[in-house]
């Protein structure tokens, strides 16, 4: 039976979101959430969780290229803990190194420079995070 998973690309001003099913291993971008200094609109996130009814959540873990933590790493972990506390769903962290670079390259290939909108980048980054999580399972 297919399990629905939601993934988040945490950022201080925008949080990308994607949904996917483990049976296909593919993800689809959802609209990004605006955040104020890393604090999302929890009502919007709750709405998406109610709509998709995921069995688990995946949060991208921002790391430096050498694997060490960066200032955003702890904030992403805190966001993951809050998701777990608010929605009582299992939350896993997934290494997200290079997802933003890959997302920008993918968008640029499709639509050129004008297509590089922040919310699109965040949603595609969330897709890449989720697809890499599926591959690691």
From Swiss-Prot:
Top EC class, one word: hydrolase
GO cellular component, one term: cytosol
Keyword Cytoplasm: yes
Function per UniProt: Could be a nuclease involved in processing of the 5'-end of pre-16S rRNA.
Listed EC numbers: 3.1.-.-
Biological source species: Actinobacillus pleuropneumoniae serotype 5b (strain L20)
Coiled-coil zones: none
GO biological process, one term: rRNA 5'-end processing
The keyword Hydrolase belongs to this UniProt entry's keyword annotation: yes
GO molecular function: nuclease activity
InterPro entries per the UniProt record, alphabetical: RNaseH-like_sf, YqgF, YqgF/RNaseH-like_dom, YqgF/RNaseH-like_dom_sf
Protein name: Putative pre-16S rRNA nuclease
Family from the record: Belongs to the YqgF nuclease family.
Subcellular location: Cytoplasm
Gene3D superfamilies, sorted: YqgF/RNase H-like domain
The entry's keywords: Cytoplasm, Hydrolase, Nuclease, Ribosome biogenesis
């Amino acid at each position: 039976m297919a399990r629905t998973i939601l993934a988040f690309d945490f950022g201080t001003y925008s949080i990308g979101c994607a949904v996917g099913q483990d049976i296909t291993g593919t993800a689809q971008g959802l609209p990004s959430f605006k955040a104020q200094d890393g604090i999302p609109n929890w009502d919007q996130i709750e709405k998406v969780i109610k709509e998709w009814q995921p069995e688990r959540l995946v949060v991208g873990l921002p790391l430096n290229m050498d694997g060490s933590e960066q200032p955003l790493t702890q904030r992403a972990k805190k966001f993951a803990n809050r998701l777990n506390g608010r929605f009582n769903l299992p939350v896993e962290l997934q290494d997200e190194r290079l997802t933003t670079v890959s997302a920008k390259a993918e968008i640029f290939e499709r639509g050129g420079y004008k297509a590089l909108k922040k919310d699109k980048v965040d949603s595609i980054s969330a897709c890449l995070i989720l697809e890499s999580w599926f591959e690691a399972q």
